[in-house]
Amino acid sequence: MQIDIQSRDVFYVSDGTAITCETLGHVVLGQFPFEANEKTFPFVESEDKLSDLLKEIEISYRATGHEPLVFFSIVIPEIKLKLLDAPAHCYDVLESIVQKVQDDTKMAPKPKLQRSRSVNKDSDKYFDRIAAIEYTLAHDDGITLKGLEEADIILLGVSRSGKTPTSLYMAMQFGLRVANYPFIHDDIARLRLLPEFEIYRHKLFGLTIDAERLTEIRENRLAGSEYASDSQCLYELQTVEGLFRREAIPYINTSSLSVEEISTRILERTGLRRRLL
């Protein structure tokens, strides 16, 4: 008997990166025969962020007639309580999930081994990941500015501001093609936006860092050099941040953030969607 595959809206919500919610949610939803329309809401740690989330839930409910499924990890009591009052089926990722999803969707779980699964689909994901990694490595640290039309995003920043690890993480975990370009000493003296970037302004995103942290990182690489001096680091950062503001390039400070947090915040700020789940 053919099963009628339904479509359900699914939200992943966290006051952190939401990566844990996504991971557990994907495992659980893989046991149910419906297509998931997924949205991720990381860093829901303020009333403003919560308000935006609740509006999205309300829109989903009114548009589909079904309460969306919300996988969440929230430690702030006030936000958690308000989320639980929303017109949605909410699952704390630390609770038992599968049985509750079964109850709410009125569907019996179907383990992956009992469902048809496309090997080609998994192969496609594998090759997409490899292609993203190869592109990112080929466009690391300004190696080449050719092929920028294929980039999903172009990261800019001073040397040692976190561009390379962030680029590789986004390629490996999200399947995104990321180019990055460092503003080196020669660039800083006459800093301007390169002509090659003009038609890709919508792809540009800046990374900056506290001067003290940058000095510490550079000292570990070239101790005692002008490159690592307090004055040089401060000068470079002030100049590059001025360019970001002047050219209206969005940017974030990476000083206290992990690579996972940097990558997730970039997705949040740009609206980019990950290609791999």
Curated annotation (Swiss-Prot):
Signal peptide (UniProt feature, chain positions): none
InterPro entries in the record: Kinase-pyrophosphorylase (IPR005177), PSRP (IPR026530)
Record-linked Pfam families: Kinase-PPPase
Protein's UniProt keywords contain Signal: no
This enzyme's EC code(s): 2.7.11.33, 2.7.4.28
GO MF annotation: an example: ADP binding
Reactions mediated catalytically: [pyruvate, water dikinase] + ADP = [pyruvate, water dikinase]-phosphate + AMP + H(+); [pyruvate, water dikinase]-phosphate + phosphate + H(+) = [pyruvate, water dikinase] + diphosphate
Keyword field: Kinase, Nucleotide-binding, Serine/threonine-protein kinase, Transferase
Residues where ADP binds: 157-164
Function description: Bifunctional serine/threonine kinase and phosphorylase involved in the regulation of the phosphoenolpyruvate synthase (PEPS) by catalyzing its phosphorylation/dephosphorylation.
NCBIfam families xrefs: PRK05339.1
Family that this chain belongs to: Belongs to the pyruvate, phosphate/water dikinase regulatory protein family. PSRP subfamily.
HAMAP family to which the protein is assigned, alphabetical: PSRP (MF_01062)
Protein name: Putative phosphoenolpyruvate synthase regulatory protein
